Amino acid sequence: MSIEAVFDQVTDPSLRAVIQEEAHKQIKDLFKETTRCNPYSIPQAGRKVLEKYAIPYNPYSLKLHPHAASKAFEVSLYEAASNYLPSTSSTPVTFMFTKPGKLRFFRRRGHVDKFVNADIVPRDLARYPRDTVYSYLPEITTTHAFIGDTLHHFGEDFLVEVFSRSPKLEVLLATMVLPPEAFYRMESLHPSVYTLLYRDDRFLYLPGGLSGGEYEHRYKDLNWLTFGTVTHGGITITGERIETKAANHLFLFRRGRLATPKFRSFDMPEPMVLLPKVFRPAKYNVQKPIPREKANKWLMYVKSIGNATIRDVWAKLRQTIANADIGLFSPTELVHLTNYFLLLGRLDSHNSFDQVLADSVLKAWFRPMVAKLQEIKHKLMGQTQFMQLCQALEMTEVDLVFEVRDSKTPHKQAVPLDREIENVLLEGVSSEPTYTETEGVADGPLPPPMQTAAEPSATSDEPESSSSREIEHQPAPEITLDEEEPQRDDLPWDAWRTQLRALGFEASERQYDPDGELISPILSTRRLPKTPIDTTLYATLDKIARCPTFYKPDTDRAQTYARDVMAGKTGAILKQQPFEWKTTLKRKTKEEPKEIHLAVLHGAGGSGKSYALQEFMRNNSDTPITVILPTNELRADWKKKLPAHDKDTFMTYENALLCPRGDIFIMDDYTKLPRGYIEAFVQNAPALSLLILTGDPNQAEHFETTEDNEINSLAPASVVFGKFSRYHINATHRNPRNLANALGVYSETPGEVKVLYTRNIKTGYHNLVPSQMKMRNYASLGQRASTYAGCQGITAPRVQIILDSDTPRCTRQVMYTALSRATTEVVLCNTMPDEKSFFQKVEATPYLKAILNLNKEIKVTEGDLTEEPPREPAPPTTHLPVENRIILNEALVEPLPDKHDREIYSNSTGFSNCIQTQDPYIQAFQHQQAKDETLFWATVEKRLAASTPKDNWTEFKTKRPLGDVLWLAYKRAMVLPDEPIKFNPELWWACADEVQKTYLSKPIHALKNGILRQSPDFDWNKLQIFLKSQWVKKIDKIGKIDVNAGQTIAAFYQPTVMLFGTMARYMRRIRDTYQPGEILINCEKNQKHISKWVESNWNHRLPAYTNDFTAYDQSQDGAMLQFEVLKALHHDIPHEVVEAYVALKLNSKMFLGTLAIMRLTGEGPTFDANTECNIAYTHARFEIPKNVAQMYAGDDCALNCRPVERQSFLPLVEKFTLKSKPKVFEQKVGSWPEFCGNLITPRGYLKDPMKLQHCLQLAQRKKPSEPGSLKDVAENYAMDLLPTYELGDALYEIFDERQMNAHYQSVRTLITCAHTKVLRVAQALQEDCTFFSSI
């Protein structure tokens, strides 16, 4: 029932009267509110538009306005803006280009608000109060400001200018009037509200369709609608569209680079399309968008009436275009529309290409090639009419969805204002007044402060003094537009040259950062009071203009740190201290704050800020000074530079807090100390009189990783103590000029830092990684590694910065720290695939073409054949005693219940059918069949998991760091070269030929069965799921009571399988050339080869370890995919192939939807990928000694040792979904490690006699007509048994009684029942060898 119908259901007159009375009260309140914000009468056409945007109006109002609807939109956005302004009227707001009378729409009284207006056009002096009009742009001294319907006339430079002149300004709100349809020069989308007039370089916005109150816009003003961020020098401003109503928009601007949407949309009343340009010259085509509904109607008309004439088309256009809309089309537009649809009517719409339904297998294979040749022919000779029609119908959707822009304003460019106001505002806006706030007692001859400060602590948190004075704004001299600032011989830092030369800098040239801004070697200067102290160190500090000043610690910060120490949430040594010591520390932090002398030395890394202090200590070793360091690495560096001092002079920060000896302390790199530590130390050090802090506020701060700590909520130390720094040395000796300038630092160091980009991890570099977990794992794999933040104090000639999914989470200071470590070379190693347009590629990737390579086959180079050594004489034959076969079978048959007690049951499909025949022995083997529907659905439920491409992508990104660890472990295990392996096209095509040859070697019926997956209409990422038909013969599954889920087979698009099968085979060939001898992969190897390897490499005196995984295929998630990506990139596989593989794994489609990331049988590289992931995981998890024999095949592995788990890997175990099933063998008779159904024994690689006997019994009990009966499999089983059979008496050295019995029964079955020739020939050869050896 609709809401309107509810009232009709009420029949009681009194109840209806009550409802109407309540409605009347609401209407009165609404009309009262509407009278305040929208009192005007709205024309009927405009009312629907207002209702669409939820703007109320009074239908009975008689008050008129020339553009009432447009005015309603303006006021509505004012009210919306008031929600983002301070809620209390006592907090001032600056209103720019706004009349004071409009404050009522913001619900403000205005007694504390400020107005900034300009005299731009003649009427401004009449509408703005004189005391609010400025001839220049003054500083905004409030935190919030508002610009009303004016910002759209200015460029982005004006916005930068407002923020750069107003350091206190935090939020700027602005309303703008810009119709988005003007991008396409369309008619007004809301003609009842406004109309548009277009000219060559400008357009007019006419509210209400009337002249007199119009806005004139340049077309570039529309760029405000796509504004995202703007960067100018050190200032970045982010804008967000808060609300849009028709052509009126409310934007909010803030400092900093914040998150913005990629796209911004605007309302489109109906879908519009832009017709393609089918005539030349281009001007004789339809230029403006038209409604898509009309375009489709006109198309269907001209195709339905037969031979359409020009008159027919004219008549249809006249019939379907409403009288009110005829004026929207110009005569030439109508002519072009008529000719366009006449052309569509004359073109043939019958498909000119061949259909494929009746194709034979041969035609189906060659059809794509024929179609491609036809397409090329038509491009050269001309298209058919059907192709012309399809091209003429490629209309462009006009949806008013635009990509949000990031832009940078040009360096030294004046604010581009409109020409009619440019001359008026040029003096006030394009010239910035230069001033600096001074504080405290002057230092005498201290050089003048620099205005180029760019330090976090140098804003509004400076200590105040009674002598502070307010500086009035003075208009600066006029600057001419579009002229470069003249270069002067005198430098802004000339007064500081003495200090700079003392640090080793000539500072005689200008250097610029990447944005073109001048880099000053001295920043953030302050005038602070001097407080002399009785120590010889004072003269040194005075000489370098670093005199100390008085300081009292913030005890709240000290107490916060003490609470975390007591709770064991910070520190390592402090956690172990007794409760009494912690209580004492907490008590001291609550005492009256001590007053000490404090000197803060700020400077870039390598600037020499600590040089004067170290020189003083070197020349005055008798002066007791204690140096406190945040890390052991930094402590070792100080000890190396000052070897004459006692080692206790240099202490880590925790030891110093435990034993604060002396009165003078230096804290180096103090920003790396825990927040609140310095204050707590001051309170805890009884004799402390002078504290010197050195550090770089641009580098990483300390961050406590323990959960629920309090100190991370405190302000960084650089913010607290930065106000006590007299200047910042923004120059370095460490980094050459190109790297330093890129970081915004001055440098005179010769040479250049080479910056490289790679996708492969190089060795021989100091690795910088974003996380502690990754650092520990890199270190455990023999890589020298530090975190981005933890590398502070390290200087290395060559640095490799590992970029992964954690890198974007790092702060600017952390990245600055990492980038400033190198002196000669920086390698940026990206371990992530390119994700910029991943989802677009998923949607837009075309079908992979099924094309056979009809080129000459190139045979892959194989290993040289080795000559077989001479055979040893066969041992004498031995007759085994006859055993009872029933004893072997009883253990399997006796515990088995009835069939239906073992089968899987489903309410919809009934029982499965895996337990077959009445033979109790055959019932011990589960027979899984593809036609078993119950088993199929049980298998799908257990083996497959549905997901979405977005969830898969999230999974992939989340587990990338795990994949990096796997790749490093695999690379180390397989002894791959450090540099990427150059791609070999000849080997690639040879592998492709092998894959193709293998596929074509299938019988014809198998090729016909796959015809659906060979068709180009089968999606490249689609797959069909089948249940594998098989007898379950794994030794641990034989005789299992409950029926288990089966195995799935995934059938992909055949060209997809061949492409990635080629990739896997190519990497296999490369792998074989580097694979160490102690590792064997059971691929393309026979029993004889493996036995020979076992004899040469396996030590049976050591314990052995084997492992299998539970649900191995389903467990290969995003971590394994990242590992495969890195492996493929290291093999230099073409990027388009790697990206296609990632897209396939993240967006594999089946009947249930998208599959989660997992391994699928039949996807191409299944075996190779399974094996290599097994190797990577095993070597990442365990410490495997060098030269230990190892065997791998898929998810099976065998190691000739008892591996020890890496401690660094323990936190990662739960992050993997892999679940191991390890076994340890002592290697003795009857207990040998099993690998792929065989036993690794001192006599070679032999078939497990128990499994062989069980399988033979199953084959013997089948009917001769059934597949897999004894006559079908006897020869194959005999070949498996032959190596064991040939050992003779040596079997007693390896088999126990149970295994010997099983071996005897197998031999007896094959010779007496199957009459196999293999064992009879072997027996004859043994007898001949025995005869000849006796002679």
Curated annotation (Swiss-Prot):
Instruction: Return the EC number.
Output: 2.7.7.48, 3.6.4.13
Name-wise, this protein is RNA replication protein
What keywords sit in the KW lines? ATP-binding, Helicase, Hydrolase, Multifunctional enzyme, Nucleotide-binding, Nucleotidyltransferase, RNA-directed RNA polymerase, Transferase, Viral RNA replication
Identify the residues that the record assigns to the (+)RNA virus helicase ATP-binding domain, covering every copy: 564-729
The UniProt entry's coiled-coil ranges are none
The lineage is:
Viruses, Riboviria, Orthornavirae, Kitrinoviricota, Alsuviricetes
Q: Outline the segment boundaries, as ranges, of region: Disordered.
A: 428-492
Domain annotation Alphavirus-like MT: ranges: 58-225
Q: Which organism is it from?
A: Foxtail mosaic virus
